[in-house]
């Protein structure tokens, strides 16, 4: 089965992209940054030597990284090779210094960063959404509370017409069908944010399963990457899984509404992700170590997540590290439209300034 997003067609097992000559999504957008930080038209590939940048990690951010990479290549001639292997793989590869940047939806704490000689900074904000394969259930129509979602993944609720689900969905016809669980099989920041949220809303989940990039699932089938989970949910009737919103929308999957910490039923969207992120205190988060699941706010999506970029503080190739940072600087300044189109939340200007100050102090 194929998985579609962002104008790319991928087989579920295809997890890497090398951008070499794709056209930008908007021919009129600003496409470069001058030495004083202002956006300008960049030199052509013929005027400057092409640079190859390698990255690996979270599938959560893959649709956006892919689009940014295509546009950056068209603007500068530089090539980005990003492998969608899961946050755990990205962390392992950047620690081993086999790539220029790693990507994780789970922030590392300062002690782990120091031990590994790494720095980290946010790249974008998105949301994890439960997705289901149920006939005649349109996207956003099925409602689940956090405790209900935990009980489903714990295996305590095993039928779609369970009284607890029906109680949250008056008037919605739910079948007498077994619930089939789909989860990640690889080390995953998406899993971290999903399990972190469930640990906040269910004491039983916290005690029995807990949180992490990999957990001991009570049952179900595992898929590799957001791509793999999306594929399995599409194939298995009565299934439920969790993916980043872009995967659900581009594959026309049915996602659920969730009840947030304020008791409101909310739909996943860039707006509800932004509402969840609006009170995030990044200035007091050392090394940007902040998780924003189960945020307060009437309109907040409860499983909102941040993607983080990991880079080595010490390097033998300062020019390569600068080229990598230039890619993210360009993306922050020129990639907001792409982020919005793919239902991510671009970073606010004040946070970008904090990140650039962090670069100056940590990546010397």
From Swiss-Prot:
The keyword Signal applies. Keywords: Periplasm, Phosphate transport, Signal, Transport. Residues 1-18 form the signal peptide. It comes from the Bacteria. The keyword Transmembrane helix does not apply. One of its GO terms (molecular function) is phosphate ion binding. Gene3D superfamilies: Periplasmic binding protein-like II (3.40.190.10). GO terms for cellular component: ATP-binding cassette (ABC) transporter complex; periplasmic space. One of its GO terms (biological process) is phosphate ion transmembrane transport. Phosphate binds at residues 58-60, 87, 105, 188-190. The complex is composed of two ATP-binding proteins (PstB), two transmembrane proteins (PstC and PstA) and a solute-binding protein (PstS). Belongs to the PstS family. Part of the ABC transporter complex PstSACB involved in phosphate import. This is Phosphate-binding protein PstS.
